[in-house]
Amino acid sequence: CRERLKEFDDLARMCITSPPYYGLRNYGDEENQIGIEQTPEDYVWELVKVFREVKNNLTEDGTLWLNIGDSYYNYRPGKGQGLVKQSVSKTNQDLPSKCNRRGNKLQGYKEKDLIGIPWLLAFALRKDGWYLRQDIIWSKPNPMPESVRDRCTKSHEYIFLFSKNQNYYFDVDAIKEPTVDGRGLKRKKSVWSVNTKPYKDAHFAVFPEELIKPCILAGSEEGDLILDPFMGSGTTAVAAKSLNRDYIGCELNHDYGLSLIHISEPTRPTPI
């Protein structure tokens, strides 16, 4: 996606995306895919490089809305059971040898540690020049069940709001919510309750449209261009089109419905 981003000619008003989670699954392209790095730090660094290109493709008042999940360290020497366990989705064991899932012990991590990938990435992006403006909690009323018995079931993920510059576009009125008595509107708070939704061709839940729409409404105006460098099943494109925005993005995985379609015309693309 880094190379593809360099080819884009138009500036997006905002980027909203959910990158491949660390150690989740194999997309079949070991050379280009993200998420199979040997260490969490390597994974974060690859994403930092992607979002450098994203910044170059944003207007000066543009924003980045980033959803990212976490992982647990799972050291099992000699058993080949893997390095991390996802708390947000089912893991796919068919991962290439490039990914450090063979029980190689990493410095600084203890077995059962929550790695803290969302915040590792957030701080790395801030250090790279992004303004870290807010952490939004995606609360999941229907989280994936977990068999673990020594902690609570994980039922949230983060959405981070970054801005390219100190002053940026944010329409607070566009996402106001009804008051309890229904007589007025109030500002949207930072905990969003949205159900997960499965994707028919994947073994895990994907970015829900109801989670994306408030981000688009707050971060752009009608007719603006929305960027997603990890388009996945195309939910960002669907949400953008429904809100009269244009969209552009790319996707490596052939299994998704977009199947390597790169949307490159900022003029009301055909429905997917």
State the predicted function of each range.
Residues 1-259:
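Core catalytic lobe of class I
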Residues 261-272:
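Single conserved hydrophobic/aromatic residue that forms the stacking wall/gate
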